[in-house]
Protein backbone atom coordinates (compact mmCIF):
# COMPACT_ATOMS: atom_id res chain seq x y z
CA UNK A 1 0.00 0.00 0.00
CA UNK A 2 2.85 2.40 0.81
CA UNK A 3 4.42 1.70 -2.58
CA UNK A 4 1.11 2.44 -4.29
CA UNK A 5 0.77 5.75 -2.42
CA UNK A 6 4.35 6.70 -3.28
CA UNK A 7 3.77 6.03 -6.99
CA UNK A 8 0.47 7.92 -6.89
CA UNK A 9 2.10 10.99 -5.32
CA UNK A 10 5.04 10.85 -7.75
CA UNK A 11 2.81 10.56 -10.80
CA UNK A 12 0.57 13.35 -9.55
CA UNK A 13 3.53 15.66 -9.04
CA UNK A 14 5.00 14.89 -12.46
CA UNK A 15 1.62 15.40 -14.12
CA UNK A 16 1.47 18.91 -12.69
CA UNK A 17 4.75 19.96 -14.34
CA UNK A 18 3.90 22.31 -17.16
CA UNK A 19 5.74 22.94 -20.39
CA UNK A 20 5.69 26.58 -21.41
CA UNK A 21 5.82 28.11 -24.87
CA UNK A 22 8.96 29.94 -23.80
CA UNK A 23 10.65 26.60 -23.11
CA UNK A 24 9.50 25.14 -26.42
CA UNK A 25 10.63 28.05 -28.59
CA UNK A 26 13.57 28.99 -26.41
CA UNK A 27 15.34 25.69 -26.98
CA UNK A 28 15.02 24.18 -23.51
CA UNK A 29 14.39 20.75 -25.03
CA UNK A 30 16.71 21.11 -28.03
CA UNK A 31 19.14 18.22 -28.44
CA UNK A 32 22.83 19.03 -28.24
CA UNK A 33 25.30 17.89 -30.85
CA UNK A 34 28.45 18.73 -32.80
CA UNK A 35 28.38 19.60 -36.50
CA UNK A 36 31.24 19.04 -38.93
CA UNK A 37 33.72 17.77 -36.35
CA UNK A 38 37.20 17.43 -37.86
CA UNK A 39 40.38 16.23 -36.19
CA UNK A 40 43.41 18.43 -36.82
CA UNK A 41 46.62 16.83 -38.06
CA UNK A 42 49.57 16.28 -35.70
CA UNK A 43 47.81 18.02 -32.83
CA UNK A 44 45.54 17.08 -29.98
CA UNK A 45 42.83 19.41 -31.27
CA UNK A 46 39.65 19.33 -33.32
CA UNK A 47 37.27 21.80 -34.95
CA UNK A 48 33.48 22.07 -34.80
CA UNK A 49 31.01 24.19 -36.75
CA UNK A 50 28.87 26.07 -34.22
CA UNK A 51 25.80 28.28 -34.53
CA UNK A 52 25.22 31.25 -32.22
CA UNK A 53 21.45 31.75 -32.03
CA UNK A 54 21.74 35.11 -30.31
CA UNK A 55 23.78 36.72 -33.10
CA UNK A 56 22.54 34.38 -35.87
CA UNK A 57 26.16 33.75 -36.82
CA UNK A 58 28.32 30.67 -37.34
CA UNK A 59 31.80 29.89 -36.07
CA UNK A 60 34.44 27.28 -36.75
CA UNK A 61 35.86 26.76 -33.27
CA UNK A 62 39.03 24.94 -32.24
CA UNK A 63 38.88 22.62 -29.20
CA UNK A 64 41.33 20.55 -27.18
CA UNK A 65 40.73 16.79 -27.03
CA UNK A 66 42.19 16.49 -23.53
CA UNK A 67 40.14 19.21 -21.86
CA UNK A 68 37.24 19.51 -24.37
CA UNK A 69 37.56 23.28 -23.92
CA UNK A 70 37.53 25.81 -26.74
CA UNK A 71 40.99 27.07 -27.64
CA UNK A 72 40.24 29.55 -30.40
CA UNK A 73 37.70 30.68 -33.00
CA UNK A 74 39.11 30.29 -36.50
CA UNK A 75 36.36 32.21 -38.29
CA UNK A 76 33.13 33.93 -37.27
CA UNK A 77 30.58 34.83 -39.96
CA UNK A 78 29.48 37.94 -38.07
CA UNK A 79 32.85 39.48 -39.00
CA UNK A 80 32.10 38.97 -42.70
CA UNK A 81 28.69 40.44 -43.63
CA UNK A 82 28.84 39.06 -47.19
CA UNK A 83 29.55 35.50 -46.06
CA UNK A 84 26.40 33.30 -45.99
CA UNK A 85 25.77 30.57 -43.45
CA UNK A 86 28.40 27.82 -43.61
CA UNK A 87 27.18 24.33 -44.55
CA UNK A 88 30.52 22.51 -44.42
CA UNK A 89 34.25 23.17 -44.58
CA UNK A 90 37.55 21.58 -45.62
CA UNK A 91 41.16 22.35 -44.70
CA UNK A 92 44.10 22.26 -47.08
CA UNK A 93 47.04 20.00 -46.22
CA UNK A 94 48.85 22.62 -44.14
CA UNK A 95 45.56 23.64 -42.47
CA UNK A 96 46.08 27.36 -43.01
CA UNK A 97 43.34 27.64 -45.67
CA UNK A 98 39.70 26.72 -45.09
CA UNK A 99 37.34 26.02 -47.98
CA UNK A 100 33.80 27.01 -46.94
CA UNK A 101 30.67 25.63 -48.64
CA UNK A 102 27.59 27.88 -48.52
CA UNK A 103 24.10 27.93 -50.07
CA UNK A 104 24.25 24.22 -50.87
CA UNK A 105 21.69 22.94 -53.38
CA UNK A 106 21.06 19.18 -53.44
CA UNK A 107 21.07 17.19 -56.68
CA UNK A 108 20.53 13.59 -55.59
CA UNK A 109 20.99 11.86 -52.23
CA UNK A 110 24.62 12.92 -51.68
CA UNK A 111 25.52 15.26 -54.54
CA UNK A 112 25.11 19.02 -54.39
CA UNK A 113 26.40 22.30 -55.75
CA UNK A 114 27.41 25.22 -53.55
CA UNK A 115 29.01 28.64 -53.38
CA UNK A 116 32.57 28.37 -52.07
CA UNK A 117 34.82 30.76 -50.17
CA UNK A 118 38.48 30.51 -49.15
CA UNK A 119 39.53 31.79 -45.75
CA UNK A 120 43.21 32.36 -44.95
CA UNK A 121 43.64 31.80 -41.22
CA UNK A 122 47.01 33.58 -41.15
CA UNK A 123 46.05 36.93 -42.66
CA UNK A 124 42.32 36.64 -41.86
CA UNK A 125 41.29 37.24 -45.48
CA UNK A 126 38.15 35.85 -47.11
CA UNK A 127 37.86 35.33 -50.89
CA UNK A 128 34.95 34.00 -52.91
CA UNK A 129 36.25 31.26 -55.17
CA UNK A 130 33.88 31.88 -58.09
CA UNK A 131 30.62 33.74 -58.65
CA UNK A 132 28.76 30.55 -59.58
CA UNK A 133 28.07 27.23 -57.90
CA UNK A 134 30.39 24.25 -58.39
CA UNK A 135 30.77 20.64 -57.27
CA UNK A 136 33.38 18.85 -55.17
CA UNK A 137 36.24 21.40 -55.09
CA UNK A 138 39.37 19.59 -53.92
CA UNK A 139 42.69 21.05 -52.80
CA UNK A 140 45.81 19.95 -54.65
CA UNK A 141 48.42 18.39 -52.32
CA UNK A 142 50.59 21.52 -52.55
CA UNK A 143 47.58 23.68 -51.59
CA UNK A 144 47.96 25.99 -54.59
CA UNK A 145 44.99 24.84 -56.67
CA UNK A 146 41.45 23.52 -56.52
CA UNK A 147 40.01 20.96 -58.92
CA UNK A 148 36.24 21.06 -59.30
CA UNK A 149 33.35 19.97 -61.50
CA UNK A 150 30.69 22.04 -63.22
CA UNK A 151 28.20 21.09 -65.94
CA UNK A 152 29.73 17.60 -66.25
CA UNK A 153 33.25 18.92 -66.92
CA UNK A 154 36.38 19.31 -64.80
CA UNK A 155 38.25 22.54 -64.10
CA UNK A 156 41.31 23.76 -62.19
CA UNK A 157 41.24 26.96 -60.13
CA UNK A 158 44.60 28.53 -59.29
CA UNK A 159 44.29 30.21 -55.90
CA UNK A 160 47.01 32.87 -56.29
CA UNK A 161 45.77 34.21 -59.64
CA UNK A 162 42.09 33.27 -59.21
CA UNK A 163 42.19 31.89 -62.76
CA UNK A 164 40.26 28.90 -64.12
CA UNK A 165 41.44 26.28 -66.62
CA UNK A 166 38.98 23.82 -68.18
CA UNK A 167 40.50 20.34 -68.56
CA UNK A 168 37.57 18.40 -70.10
CA UNK A 169 35.25 19.64 -72.81
CA UNK A 170 32.88 16.82 -73.74
CA UNK A 171 30.61 16.88 -70.69
CA UNK A 172 26.91 17.05 -71.61
CA UNK A 173 23.89 16.61 -69.33
CA UNK A 174 22.37 13.11 -69.61
CA UNK A 175 25.20 12.01 -71.89
CA UNK A 176 28.79 12.43 -70.66
CA UNK A 177 29.89 13.03 -67.05
CA UNK A 178 33.52 13.77 -66.18
CA UNK A 179 34.75 13.37 -62.62
CA UNK A 180 31.33 13.03 -60.95
CA UNK A 181 29.48 9.74 -60.54
CA UNK A 182 26.22 8.98 -62.30
CA UNK A 183 23.04 8.27 -60.35
CA UNK A 184 23.77 4.54 -60.04
CA UNK A 185 27.28 4.92 -58.62
CA UNK A 186 26.18 7.65 -56.23
CA UNK A 187 23.21 5.65 -54.98
CA UNK A 188 24.73 2.16 -54.84
CA UNK A 189 28.38 2.90 -54.01
CA UNK A 190 27.78 6.01 -51.88
CA UNK A 191 30.31 8.38 -53.41
CA UNK A 192 30.11 11.43 -55.68
CA UNK A 193 33.63 12.66 -56.43
CA UNK A 194 35.24 10.55 -59.16
CA UNK A 195 38.55 12.40 -59.54
CA UNK A 196 41.69 13.11 -57.53
CA UNK A 197 45.10 14.74 -57.71
CA UNK A 198 48.42 12.95 -57.97
CA UNK A 199 51.03 13.51 -55.26
CA UNK A 200 52.96 16.16 -57.22
CA UNK A 201 49.83 18.26 -57.95
CA UNK A 202 50.39 18.29 -61.73
CA UNK A 203 47.95 15.58 -62.85
CA UNK A 204 44.34 14.59 -62.17
CA UNK A 205 42.89 11.10 -62.58
CA UNK A 206 39.14 10.91 -63.16
CA UNK A 207 36.34 8.57 -64.18
CA UNK A 208 34.33 9.36 -67.30
CA UNK A 209 30.73 8.13 -67.47
CA UNK A 210 29.08 7.70 -70.88
CA UNK A 211 25.36 7.35 -70.19
CA UNK A 212 24.21 8.00 -73.76
CA UNK A 213 22.52 4.60 -74.01
CA UNK A 214 20.92 4.68 -70.56
CA UNK A 215 17.12 5.18 -70.70
CA UNK A 216 15.74 8.42 -69.28
CA UNK A 217 13.31 8.76 -66.40
CA UNK A 218 11.17 11.84 -65.75
CA UNK A 219 9.66 12.78 -62.40
CA UNK A 220 7.68 15.75 -61.10
CA UNK A 221 9.31 17.96 -58.47
CA UNK A 222 6.69 19.74 -56.34
CA UNK A 223 8.77 21.97 -54.08
CA UNK A 224 9.67 24.73 -56.52
CA UNK A 225 6.50 26.76 -56.92
CA UNK A 226 2.79 26.52 -57.59
CA UNK A 227 3.24 23.96 -60.37
CA UNK A 228 5.59 20.97 -60.46
CA UNK A 229 8.80 21.04 -62.47
CA UNK A 230 9.78 17.97 -64.46
CA UNK A 231 13.25 16.57 -63.85
CA UNK A 232 14.66 14.16 -66.43
CA UNK A 233 17.72 12.06 -65.69
CA UNK A 234 19.33 8.78 -66.71
CA UNK A 235 17.95 5.90 -64.69
CA UNK A 236 18.68 2.28 -65.67
CA UNK A 237 15.98 -0.10 -64.48
CA UNK A 238 16.62 -3.84 -64.18
CA UNK A 239 17.79 -5.27 -67.49
CA UNK A 240 18.54 -1.89 -69.08
CA UNK A 241 21.97 -0.56 -70.04
CA UNK A 242 24.19 1.10 -67.47
CA UNK A 243 26.65 3.89 -68.14
CA UNK A 244 29.91 2.92 -69.82
CA UNK A 245 32.87 3.75 -67.57
Q: Which role does the model predict for each range below?
A:
Residues 15-245:
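Beta-propeller folds
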Residues 1-11:
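Sec-dependent N-terminal signal peptides
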Amino acid sequence: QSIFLFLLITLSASAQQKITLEEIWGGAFRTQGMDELQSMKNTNQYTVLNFDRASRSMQIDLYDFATLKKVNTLIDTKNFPNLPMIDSYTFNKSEDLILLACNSKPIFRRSFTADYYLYDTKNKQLTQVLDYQIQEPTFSPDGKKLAFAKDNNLFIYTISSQSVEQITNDGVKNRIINGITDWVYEEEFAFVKAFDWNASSDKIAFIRFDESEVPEFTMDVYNQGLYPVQQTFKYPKAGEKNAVV
